[in-house]
Regions:
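N-terminal leader/linker segments that initiate helical-solenoid repeat arrays
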Residues: 35-87, 451
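Charge-biased low-complexity segments
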Residues: 42, 53, 57, 82, ...
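Bacterial N-terminal signal peptides
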Residues: 21-31
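N-terminal secretory signal peptides that target proteins for export/translocation
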Residues: 1-16
Length: 454
């Protein structure tokens, strides 16, 4: 045993012992890491799946180790690091670490530009992730800058009028609708119809998202999500160079164009699925594709009925509601439309209370207003009664004013649209009331005052 100790402590063998120990530790580390890391090609799809399944916390440390192995093997600027950087960003985002997620996305973006070029279309997916993260952080200006940059990159790669740009046009239009830029959205959806007109001849159903977007832009113009005096000033801004919004100013208040877009969608669906137009059809006579067509046609017709109701054409809306109710009933348990209770179509956002300077030191408290009401056959709110209010009277007027402007799709039965009582609307909000002093806090405040005076 002594001889063994003497042997190990000799200078010649000390370095060998250290090298041997390092080799054993490295071998054990590779054993702990997934077998996929030890292979030349690393499959990261499993990590992507686990992140989608909300299992990011269980795999993020392992993913960091995988990143380190790839970086050691391939170098700090290897394109092999792009995907793990994206996955690390996705994982951190799932865990709510949005700033850290952006750092990973920034690195992935830098690696993509370094390896594939400054304006490479491969970077668009990363930029979209950055935009979505900024939206979660409620940084709307930064999110818009990212969305518009991704659009410009793809437009440069494919051509501004290429049908390959249609997915980017659709996404940009959806973003503008989310951020209340109805003119920008309208211009993009029209551009999409022009760019895809050749492709839409063979598959007109592919034009439906753009037609629906045009209708939604008019609906958003007429029914803004909040009370504003001149909302057109907020709706005509875009950083996209080839998007001219000047001509769209002439489309303001041209609401029949939105109705025509919805009517065109119905015509496309009827042409696509002629079997569902037959008044004698039943669910049993339709195959899976035709059944899906019937559901989509019903939804398109319902969108037009809701449009009529929103724009005050109640008689037209009721006629269509009765027709859709009958068509949906033909599908029996396969019908996907529920008319058993009113559905909210529009309600303005209730303005929150302002935290003024004198309230700056107060902690927010939870308030609530609860109102019961009736929805009549025209979709309007009647007979409101406040059943709960705390603090009493603080937000009652704002809530009731909002409900007076609300529009519901009424309950529909065999006889058509009907009145519905017993509906409830509940609004919770933050307010800043004075905090009641406890004896302990009062005593502490007195001590602080004495120390200051001394």
């Amino acid at each position: 045993m002594a001889g063994f100790s003497t042997f190990c402590s000799s200078p010649e063998q000390s370095g060998l012992k250290t090298l041997l120990t390092s080799f054993i530790v490295f071998t054990l580390a590779l054993t702990v890491l997934p077998s996929v890391v030890r292979s030349q090609t690393i499959d990261l799809s499993e990590y992507s799946t686990q992140i989608r399944l909300n299992e990011a916390e269980s795999i993020i440390d392992e993913l960091r180790e995988v990143f380190g192995v790839i970086e050691t093997r391939s170098g700090a600027y290897s394109p092999d690091l792009i995907e793990p950087s994206i996955l690390l960003g996705d994982a951190e985002r799932k865990l709510g670490e949005l700033t850290t997620a952006l750092e990973h996305y920034d690195r992935a973006l830098h690696l993509t530009r370094t390896n594939f070029g400054l304006f490479s279309p491969e970077q668009a997916d990363i930029v979209y992730r950055q935009s979505s993260t900024y939206l979660e952080m409620r940084s709307f200006i930064l999110a818009q800058e990212k969305e518009e940059y991704a659009y410009e990159v793809l437009s440069r790669a494919y051509g501004s009028n290429s049908p390959d740009l249609l997915p980017a046009i659709q996404r940009m239009g959806e973003f503008y609708l989310k951020t209340f830029n109805f003119l920008g959205a309208r211009a993009l959806y029209k551009k999409g119809l022009r760019s895809g007109q050749d492709a839409f001849r063979d598959k007109p159903q592919n034009s439906i998202p753009f037609l629906k977007g045009i209708a939604d832009s008019y609906k958003l113009e007429r029914f803004p999500p909040y009370y504003v005096e001149d909302y057109s000033q907020n709706a005509g801004q875009s950083g996209i160079r080839d998007l001219d919004l000047t001509s769209e100013l002439y489309t303001i208040n041209n609401f029949p164009a939105g109705e025509r877009a919805l009517q065109e969608i119905i015509a496309i669906r009827r042409q696509q699925f002629p079997q569902t137009v037959d008044p004698e059809f039943t669910a049993e006579t339709l195959d899976a594709t035709e059944l899906q067509g019937a559901l989509e046609l019903n939804q398109a017709t319902l969108d037009l009925a809701d449009w009529h109701l929103l724009f005050g054409r109640v008689r037209d809306a009721r006629t269509l509601y009765a027709y859709i109710f009958e068509q949906n009933a033909k599908l029996a348990d396969k019908g996907n439309l529920d008319f058993s209770s009113p559905s909210l179509l529009y309600v303005p956002t209730i303005k929150p209370l302002i935290k003024t300077r004198e309230k700056a030191g107060r902690e927010p408290s939870q308030g609530i207003v609860k109102v019961t009401f009736e929805v009549n056959a025209n979709g309007r709110v009647r007979n409101m009664e406040t059943v709960e209010s705390y603090p009493k009277g603080l937000m009652d007027f704002r809530v009731r004013r909002t409900l007076r402007d609300a529009i519901y799709r009424p309950k529909i039965d065999d006889s058509g649209a009907v009145n519905t009582t017993g509906q409830t609307f509940e609004h919770k909000f933050e307010h800043y009331e004075l905090v009641t002093k406890t004896p302990e806090s009062a005593e502490k405040e007195g001590q602080n005052s004495n120390e200051t005076a001394g």
